[in-house]
Regions:
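Long, positively charged amphipathic alpha-helical accessory segments at protein N-termini or as interdomain linkers
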Residues: 79, 139-162, 174-176, 180-241
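N-terminal nucleophile
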Residues: 167
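Charged, low-complexity interaction regions
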Residues: 16-26, 36
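A glycine-rich, hydrophobic loop/mini-helix early in the fold
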Residues: 103-133
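Short, conserved charged micro-motifs
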Residues: 98-100, 137-141
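Structural motif
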Residues: 170-171
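Active-site loop/lid in soluble adenylation, ligation, and acyl-transfer enzymes
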Residues: 11, 15, 38-99, 112-114, ...
Length: 241
């Protein structure tokens, strides 16, 4: 059985030995005695433990207010889980060009999320989540998406769900897009989950990639957005929605 608390104390001792110029012991060998297969296994378990120890404020908000709210949490260094159900079409624009005129003509709200990524389109049946927490060692978008993939794996066959950079794909189609807002001390993260087919809408707003790298849009069909929301909250807080 893994003893994460003892392993963390052992790591502190190892670091202190090095700072004091003492001959350090083999940390990689010692943690194996505490149940860890290797250093990567330990660091992943350490991050899981650190997140499990965090206290989060949980807040319902709207996608139109989320960006400002996330920035407010980050400025305050306040841990937060922001939950958002989308009930209208919204265009989240990054650094890439998109059909702004179509959005204006059809009264589609445009939100600038200040990212180097492309445009993400939300439809009426979406779930978005925002997370703000300390920028812990090893905490990345991939880490969080992998945890969400583990949830989806319970509903889909092996190999159907894949993490691809800042996206989650199901059977090769994009069902989730994520954005990160990291600073040296605070980690901000948002993810948008699709629960219906918006291929036609995306084709009208998003221009084809010059490199041909656009991912085919898909949607989650084996659990509802309420069920996904509850699963993510259980992972982060062990509390039901």
């Amino acid at each position: 059985m893994k003893n994460i608390k003892e392993a963390i104390e052992l790591e502190k001792q190892y670091i202190q030995f090095r700072l004091e110029g003492k001959e350090p012991f083999s940390f990689a060998n010692e943690i194996k005695k505490l149940g860890f297969a290797n250093l990567n296994d330990y660091y992943n378990a350490k991050l899981d433990y650190q997140i499990s120890e965090l206290e989060f404020s949980i807040e319902e908000t709207s996608p139109l207010e989320a960006a400002a709210l996330i920035m407010s949490y980050m400025r305050q260094k306040k841990n937060g889980i922001l939950l958002m159900d989308t009930h209208e079409v919204i265009a989240y624009c990054g650094s890439k060009d998109f059909n702004r005129d179509y959005c204006i003509e059809n009264n589609i709200p445009i939100i600038d999320y200040y990212s180097n990524g492309g445009t993400m389109i939300a439809s009426e049946n979406e779930f978005n989540i925002g997370l703000v927490m300390p920028h812990l060692e090893g905490l990345t978008s991939t880490y969080i998406l992998q945890k969400i993939k583990n949830i989806l794996d319970k509903y889909y066959d092996k190999g159907e769900v894949v993490v691809d950079h800042n996206d989650i794909l199901i059977n090769g189609k994009k069902v989730c897009g994520a954005t990160v807002y990291p600073t040296s001390e605070v980690f901000g993260f948002t993810a948008q989950f699709s629960f219906d087919d918006k291929s036609e809408l995306i084709s009208k707003i998003c221009y084809p990639s010059k490199s041909g790298s656009n991912k085919e849009p898909g949607f989650i069909d084996k659990l509802t957005r309420k069920e996904l929301r509850e699963e993510i909250l259980l992972w982060l807080t062990n509390k039901e929605a």
